[in-house]
C-alpha cells in the first residue's frame, strides 16, 4: 500500500459482489423467518376433513399455529364452530 492508495480509500465493490452480498442477507433473513414445518398445511387439510365429518365448517374456520418455546413446540388449533 502506498501513500496514494491511502488517500483514495478503499476500492469500490463491483455491482455483482454487492448484489451477491444483498442476496445472501435476504436468504438468511427468509430462513430465519421460516418457522412453519412443511407438514403443517397438510395437517390442517386433514384435520379440516375430519372435522367436516361432524360439523359443517369452512376452511377459514380452522387456524393452526406452531410456536417454539425453547425445547418445546406448541401446536395450537382454533376452530370457529357455527351457531346451532
UniProtKB/Swiss-Prot annotation:
Gene3D superfamilies referenced in this protein's UniProt entry, alphabetically? Cell division topological specificity factor MinE
Keyword Cell division (UniProt): yes
Asked if Cell division is a keyword of the record, the answer is yes
Q: Kindly list the residue ranges recorded as spanning the membrane.
A: none
Any one of the GO BP annotations: cell division
S-S pairs: none
InterPro entries associated with the record:
MinE, MinE_sf
- Give the domain of life: Bacteria
Query: Could you tell me what this protein does?
Result: Prevents the cell division inhibition by proteins MinC and MinD at internal division sites while permitting inhibition at polar sites. This ensures cell division at the proper site by restricting the formation of a division septum at the midpoint of the long axis of the cell.
* HAMAP family per the UniProt record, alphabetical: MinE
Its recorded name reads: Cell division topological specificity factor
Q: What is the lineage of its organism?
A: Bacteria, Pseudomonadati, Pseudomonadota, Gammaproteobacteria, Pseudomonadales
Amino acid at each position: 500500500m502506498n501513500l496514494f492508495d491511502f488517500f483514495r480509500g478503499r476500492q469500490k465493490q463491483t455491482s455483482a459482489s454487492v448484489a451477491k452480498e444483498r442476496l445472501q442477507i435476504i436468504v438468511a433473513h427468509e430462513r430465519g423467518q421460516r418457522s412453519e414445518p412443511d407438514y403443517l398445511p397438510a395437517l390442517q387439510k386433514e384435520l379440516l376433513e375430519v372435522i367436516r365429518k361432524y360439523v359443517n365448517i369452512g376452511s377459514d374456520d380452522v387456524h393452526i399455529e406452531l410456536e417454539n418455546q425453547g425445547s418445546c413446540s406448541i401446536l395450537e388449533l382454533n376452530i370457529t364452530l357455527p351457531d346451532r
